[in-house]
């Protein structure tokens, strides 16, 4: 049963005025009476629309600098009144039914994100009347349509035209869900903001704020259901943040191929975040969340050729990320050479897409160009809890490194050291990366002892016939013993970059000096678990 309800009277009060004039014009043209408040009412009147100010409708003026506008029985009675049940009381108090409420809320998130935002500014951008109307209309969705997203305007008009000016219960219910999601997210932002403020729970502390709120409220929107999770017996879905400010797998557009799997998304994220570290044309190949080949080159084709050489065996069925547009020549090289699950790049040429289309199972994603990294939070679920930390956006430049050995690195060793240090940040701990001439030549990932990661990196290089002599090695954390340096020297490494900080640093440095290895300390660790 559709349970249509005609829309005869609508109340419009929005902070984000995108599309509101056109929507109001469409409603008015269909005979809908318009009520409005403040700036929205002035805008509609300026556009020549017949609009009644809420203060005129209620007979009660806006007051307290706009803090009190819609908190009135004639407004909320009109929204909450149940058709066929509350008609008599509404008539007794001259309350007219309001069939549609169009509201979006004060821009609290944008306000508190501004540099120098004061507590007073934040407080004045806490909407009171808006959420109250939204919740009232959503509660009474049986009779009232609540609209909180401008993206719904066109669909609402189309449905009204198809139903003689009415909306169905199914649509009103769907709009109500969006409304409750909207107010929940809004209240969560406010709670998170106040929860991280002094003196909310820091007692007499003079610190400006705590980094993390007392109660962490998170809101994510389901982007897609998945066939299954990490394994076929696990159900899964992909949720994304509403306003992501950085190019990411969450915001990427899939332009080709079958649906992404759970593991595809996780691996694509790892590949994309790694390739973002490089300014030069770069390619990152990932398998099971670990880079198995990374290189920079004169072009993305050159970078791909060099990245692939690191470990062609592991590259099979991998994820490939670029930081430049995917061109036809590179696409052809990939398709001719290997099986690939996903290719992600800022963009893809039409010619490249024609080539990859020949392989229906190849998923191609475009994510747009990216600017600087955006600070945010990383989460790790544990049974019964959630670990929260800042994103690891740390990186060192040449000027921040400390040479701790007798020998200084050559210019090429230094370039390779900085290159493999960027890669090591994205390799599972314990992470060891060998690099030479701006390409990885061996990667040791995820071993329980650092020396075995160093040995594996050397074995990988030897298996592919890659020359290790003269290469640089990066370690994501300090060496607890000299054995990792001995293993690297045996393979041919001549420069090591690592955080330092071990109680045996002197022994490790002495080992490097014995082997004639230049060693650089970053004073920054990049564990990845």
Swiss-Prot record:
The name this protein goes by in its record: Bifunctional purine biosynthesis protein PurH
Entry annotated with the keyword Transmembrane: no
Molecular functions per Gene Ontology: IMP cyclohydrolase activity; phosphoribosylaminoimidazolecarboxamide formyltransferase activity
Residue numbers carrying N6-acetyllysine: 287
Pathway per the UniProt entry: Purine metabolism; IMP biosynthesis via de novo pathway; 5-formamido-1-(5-phospho-D-ribosyl)imidazole-4-carboxamide from 5-amino-1-(5-phospho-D-ribosyl)imidazole-4-carboxamide (10-formyl THF route): step 1/1; Purine metabolism; IMP biosynthesis via de novo pathway; IMP from 5-formamido-1-(5-phospho-D-ribosyl)imidazole-4-carboxamide: step 1/1
Designated gene of the protein: purH
Superkingdom per UniProt: Bacteria
Keyword Ligase tagged: no
Keywords carried by this UniProt record: Acetylation, Hydrolase, Multifunctional enzyme, Purine biosynthesis, Transferase
Entries under PANTHER family matching the protein: BIFUNCTIONAL PURINE BIOSYNTHESIS PROTEIN ATIC, BIFUNCTIONAL PURINE BIOSYNTHESIS PROTEIN PURH
């Amino acid at each position: 049963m559709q349970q249509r309800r005609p829309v005869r009277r609508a109340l419009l009060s929005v902070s984000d005025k995108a599309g509101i004039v056109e929507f109001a014009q469409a409603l008015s043209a269909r005979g809908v009476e318009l009520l409005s408040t403040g700036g929205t009412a002035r805008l509609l009147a300026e556009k020549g629309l017949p609009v009644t100010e809420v203060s005129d409708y209620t007979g009660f003026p806006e007051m307290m600098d706009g803090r009190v506008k819609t908190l009135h029985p004639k407004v909320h009675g009109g929204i909450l009144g149940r058709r066929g049940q509350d008609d008599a009381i509404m008539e007794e108090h001259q309350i007219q039914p309001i069939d549609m409420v169009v509201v979006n809320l004060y821009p609290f998130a944008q306000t508190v994100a501004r540099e120098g935002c004061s507590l007073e500014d934040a407080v004045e951008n806490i909407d009171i009347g808006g959420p109250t109307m939204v919740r009232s209309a959503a509660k009474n969705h049986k009779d009232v349509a609540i609209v909180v997203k401008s993206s719904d305007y066109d669909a609402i008009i189309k449905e009204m035209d198809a139903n003689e000016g009415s909306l169905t219960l199914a649509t009103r219910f769907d709009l109500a869900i969006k409304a409750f999601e909207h107010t929940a997210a809004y209240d969560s932002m406010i709670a998170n903001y106040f929860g991280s403020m002094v003196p909310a729970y820091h007692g007499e502390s003079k610190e400006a704020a705590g980094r993390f709120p007392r109660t962490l409220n998170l809101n994510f929107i389901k982007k897609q259901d998945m066939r299954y999770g990490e394994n076929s017996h696990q159900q899964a879905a992909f949720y994304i943040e509403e306003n992501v400010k950085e190019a990411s797998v969450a915001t990427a557009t899939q332009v080709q191929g079958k649906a992404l799997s759970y593991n595809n998304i996780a691996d694509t994220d790892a590949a994309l975040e790694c390739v973002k570290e490089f300014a030069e044309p770069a390619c990152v190949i990932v398998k099971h969340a670990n880079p198995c080949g990374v290189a920079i080159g004169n072009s993305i084709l050159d970078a791909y050729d060099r990245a692939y050489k690191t470990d062609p065996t592991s590259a099979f069925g991998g994820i490939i990320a670029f930081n430049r547009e995917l061109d036809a020549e590179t696409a052809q090289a990939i398709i001719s050479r290997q099986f690939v699950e996903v290719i992600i790049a800022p963009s893809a040429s039409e010619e490249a897409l024609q080539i990859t289309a020949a392989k229906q199972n190849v998923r191609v994603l475009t994510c747009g160009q990216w600017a600087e990294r955006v600070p945010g939070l990383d989460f790790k679920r544990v049974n019964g809890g959630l670990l929260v930390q800042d994103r690891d956006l740390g990186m060192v430049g040449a000027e921040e490194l400390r040479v701790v050995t007798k020998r200084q690195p050559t210019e090429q060793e230094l370039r390779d050291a900085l290159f493999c240090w960027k890669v090591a940040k994205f390799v599972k701990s314990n992470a060891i990366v060998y690099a030479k001439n701006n390409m990885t030549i061996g990667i040791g990932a995820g071993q329980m002892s650092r020396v075995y990661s160093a040995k594996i990196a050397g074995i990988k290089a030897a298996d592919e016939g890659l020359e290790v002599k003269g290469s640089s090695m990066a370690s994501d954390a300090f060496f607890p013993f000299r054995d990792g340096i001995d293993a690297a020297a045996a393979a041919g490494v001549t420069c090591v970059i690592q955080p330092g900080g071990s109680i045996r640093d002197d022994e490790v440095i002495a080992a490097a000096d014995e082997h004639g290895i230049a060693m650089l300390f970053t004073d920054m660790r990049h564990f990845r678990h």
